[in-house]
């Protein structure tokens, strides 16, 4: 039976997910805050700015700039806006849900954002829970994993994780997305999934910088592996399950983000490695590079949690203190020797 779904955010990922859900037979409204973008998409049946001229919108997909219309009778609300816009969009959604209260079952809230809120250091599900009270929604699900919109647009096989404190909600969302090229697994470790999704963007900036500087595969593999160790340390300290970080939303997302030219964070790092200045890089990208703001949040979080994150600290120095990339690499390599694992205190169970 078709489900009424509102997808909020008509960037590359929001558009592709809305298209996929429409392909799966659901009734989908894709919302953009920009009326001009909506008019262009309706006229051309494309989202050329984000996805090129080859990608065509499903005929049944409804694009709108009217948030109330998009949310009307929606059983699922999927947030696919940049991290820095999550709170403001949720605040626009709240009064509409309040007006709809009592009309039927509350909607499931889903988000596909990969970042942390600057200032509060909150994960995205925490931001949504703070703005949208329990009486207005069924619960919150996060979808995350190794996924570039460009690959999903061409029906490349893709697997993600649907995570929620409520497994039944995760399973409902899982069923909405599943088809012959898109597969979701469920997980109840929301903390681990969101931390992996956010912090891999920081490491991807570093991976891109190494490529821009001409470093080889050995160096990139070292960065990714030790970067995953940092992500795992902070995640477990926050209460995540260690096994999550060897799953799709951990190492899976890290691999795809650190190795692909589709990754905005990788491309930004690559440009920095080639000598471009950060303001110019961000201006030329024309799209949000989540890892830049996440680096600042992660740097502060590491201090507050007393977690060792030397790679994250090095990337912070490059982005926010104008440190030369080769200098921070040298500093990383000159650190004192230490064991790879602390087997005496290691455990597959969180402390």
From Swiss-Prot:
Family: Belongs to the NAD-dependent glycerol-3-phosphate dehydrogenase family.
Leader peptide range in chain numbering: none
Function noted in UniProt: Catalyzes the reduction of the glycolytic intermediate dihydroxyacetone phosphate (DHAP) to sn-glycerol 3-phosphate (G3P), the key precursor for phospholipid synthesis.
Active site location: 200
EC number(s) reported in the record: 1.1.1.94
Pathway annotation from the record: Membrane lipid metabolism; glycerophospholipid metabolism
Annotated binding of NADPH, by residue: 12-13, 33, 114, 149, 264, 288, 290
A cellular-component GO term for this protein: cytosol
GO molecular-function term, one example from the UniProt record: glycerol-3-phosphate dehydrogenase [NAD(P)+] activity
Pfam families the record matches: NAD_Gly3P_dh_C, NAD_Gly3P_dh_N
Coiled-coil ranges per UniProt: none
Protein name according to UniProt: Glycerol-3-phosphate dehydrogenase [NAD(P)+]
GO biological process: one example: glycerol-3-phosphate catabolic process
Enzyme class, UniProt record, top EC level: oxidoreductase
Top-rank lineage group of the source organism: Bacteria
Alphabetized UniProt keyword annotations: Cytoplasm, Lipid biosynthesis, Lipid metabolism, NAD, NADP, Nucleotide-binding, Oxidoreductase, Phospholipid biosynthesis, Phospholipid metabolism
Name of the gene this protein is made from: gpsA
Binding site for sn-glycerol 3-phosphate: 114, 145, 147, 200, 253, 263-265
Catalyzed chemical reaction(s): sn-glycerol 3-phosphate + NAD(+) = dihydroxyacetone phosphate + NADH + H(+); sn-glycerol 3-phosphate + NADP(+) = dihydroxyacetone phosphate + NADPH + H(+)
Localization per record: Cytoplasm
Gene3D superfamilies named in the record: N-(1-d-carboxylethyl)-l-norvaline Dehydrogenase, domain 2, NAD(P)-binding Rossmann-like Domain
NCBIfam families in the record: PRK00094.1-2, PRK00094.1-3, PRK00094.1-4
Location (main, coarse): cytoplasm
